[in-house]
Structures are given as structure tokens and as C-alpha cells.
Design a protein with these regions (language model features):
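Conserved beta-strand elements of the Class I
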Residues: 49-51, 132, 225-229
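Rossmann-fold NAD(P)-dependent oxidoreductase module
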Residues: 37, 41, 117, 241
Length: 271
């Protein structure tokens, strides 16, 4: 960071706006849902390109998402984004973001907005706007640097952000709670602070032909037993959501971005 701030290491600036969505804590703040939210809000006005590293993919270098892409090729997050928005936007992965942006613009010169997923620490790209996420239940001002805590860099890194979003907020936040975040984050006047929360969608059957009536979350009877299988960094907000609906939740937790195997399926069936 010091080398970039002193101009010893150079940042690449691009002719199109580049919006960075990231965090300063390890995993679980909701970067990909917020990227999808931005895509949905802006895709009618812009030709959008989304670029990420492609976490846990088996490939290397630049890979452009296509109908033939698998999660193993481009990472599960990029795969999810492409499945949702498909050919209406350009999705690619590349470890070197400068190279990735250049390749995307070569392939599709109509792109006039780039979204970088999880690139706040990748400073070789000069962002037009930097958006940093911090989780409501574990905000940066209550966290510590690795390895004691989860912070990738110090709280002072927030000074580079244009926008800070407190994610996964409860639906019943009180005005005083908003004020606590404002005071503890202590942002500069030029920085904007927002708060977001999840609205969980409807249940989608894994095997549609085997299910006649898909229940909704709201239709769950008190005490309904649910086996919840997760492969995300922090499943607690979702589990709390289900328990508020009086469901009897049994959690089967796998690691973030877990690649499910046949033996996992056998283990789940035993539950």
C-alpha cells in the first residue's frame, strides 16, 4: 500500500469506469450479491463487464464465461452471475485484473462499465469508485488483523473507499443502531454510508420433477424440521432467518465454496 501511495508502484487507469466491490475482512460480507444488485440496477443503461479472480477454479489465466462454462472453469461465483445474467453482460475471470480488463475490452469493445468482484486489495487497477462492505454482526471496528481477527488490512484502508455498505442488517434496526455505526466508522465527508439486508427468495427444488408443491418460507409450520446444508462462509444469518420462523433447524455445514462430492451426498442422506 505504501508503494502505491508513494507512486513507486503504478496504477493502471482505463477509459471506461471501473467499480470495485470488496472488503477488508476475510469472506462472508456478501460481495457477490451486491455485484448482482449493481448489475441488475445498471444493465439497462450500460454494457457491463464483470471480472473476478475465479476463486477455487481449476483453470489459470483469462477465461471468458460462456454457455459451456462450468463452476470448475470460472469459479462458482462467476458461474452464478453468468447463469443469472447470461449473454446480456460479459463475465470473465483472471488473476491479473489489468490483463483481464484489457482482454474483456478487446473481446467486447461495447463494454462501458467494468465491475471488479473482490478487488479492493488489487491496487494495480485504479478504480473510478471503490465500494467496501462490512458485515453488521462483525463490523471492521470490532475486528482485528489476521491472524487474531479476520482483517486483511487495517481499518485505515477504509479511507480509500468511496462508499461503505453495512451488509446483512436485521430488518428491525433502530435509529440508534444506525448512529452507532456512523460514529464508529467515522467516515470522511466525501464518503457515503449505506445499509443493506437480504430478502430471501423462494425455494427452488434441486430436482423439479420430484417435487409437486414447493413450500415457501412463510408457509412453514412452527417446529417444521429442516436440514440446512450450507457451503458459504457465514450461514448464521440464514439460520437465524429460519429460526425466526420457528423452524427446527439442523445445520450441516461445509466450508466456503465447497465442492460437493458423492461421499458428501451419502453423508447428507444419513442426516
Amino acid at each position: 500500500n505504501k508503494l502505491f501511495e508513494q507512486g513507486i508502484l503504478k496504477q493502471q487507469e482505463f477509459s471506461v469506469p471501473v467499480v470495485v466491490v470488496g472488503n477488508i475482512a476475510m469472506g462472508g460480507t456478501g460481495k457477490t450479491p451486491h455485484v448482482e444488485y449493481i448489475v441488475e440496477a445498471l444493465m439497462e443503461k450500460y454494457n457491463i463487464g464483470v471480472l473476478s479472480r475465479g476463486y477455487k477454479r481449476s483453470t489459470k489465466g483469462f477465461v471468458l464465461a460462456s454457455q459451456q462454462s462450468r463452476p470448475e472453469d470460472i469459479g462458482d461465483e462467476s458461474y452464478q452471475i453468468y447463469r443469472k445474467f447470461g449473454p446480456e453482460i460479459t463475465v470473465a475471470v483472471c488473476e491479473k485484473r489489468v490483463d483481464g480488463i484489457n482482454r474483456m475490452l478487446e473481446i467486447n469493445p461495447k463494454i462501458n462499465l467494468i465491475l471488479l468482484d473482490d478487488a479492493f486489495q488489487h491496487r494495480y487497477v485504479k478504480p473510478s469508485v471503490s465500494i467496501v462492505l462490512t458485515e453488521h454482526n462483525r463490523p471492521v471496528f470490532k475486528d482485528s488483523l489476521l491472524p487474531y481477527g479476520r482483517l486483511r488490512e487495517s481499518r485505515g484502508a477504509l479511507n480509500r473507499a468511496d462508499i461503505v455498505i453495512v451488509t446483512k442488517c436485521p430488518p428491525d434496526m433502530k435509529p440508534m443502531q444506525y448512529r452507532i455505526f456512523e460514529e464508529n466508522l467515522n467516515l470522511f465527508p466525501f464518503q457515503k454510508l449505506y445499509f443493506s439486508r437480504y430478502n430471501y427468495g423462494h425455494l427452488v427444488p434441486v430436482f423439479p420433477d420430484a417435487v409437486e408443491n414447493v413450500p415457501s418460507f412463510d408457509s412453514l409450520d412452527p417446529g417444521t424440521p429442516l436440514l440446512v446444508v450450507t457451503g458459504v462462509a457465514n450461514p448464521k444469518p440464514f439460520v437465524r432467518y429460519l429460526r425466526r420462523r420457528k423452524a427446527k433447524v439442523k445445520l450441516k455445514r461445509f466450508g466456503d465454496h465447497h465442492n460437493f462430492s458423492s461421499s458428501d451426498m451419502v453423508e447428507i442422506e444419513k442426516e
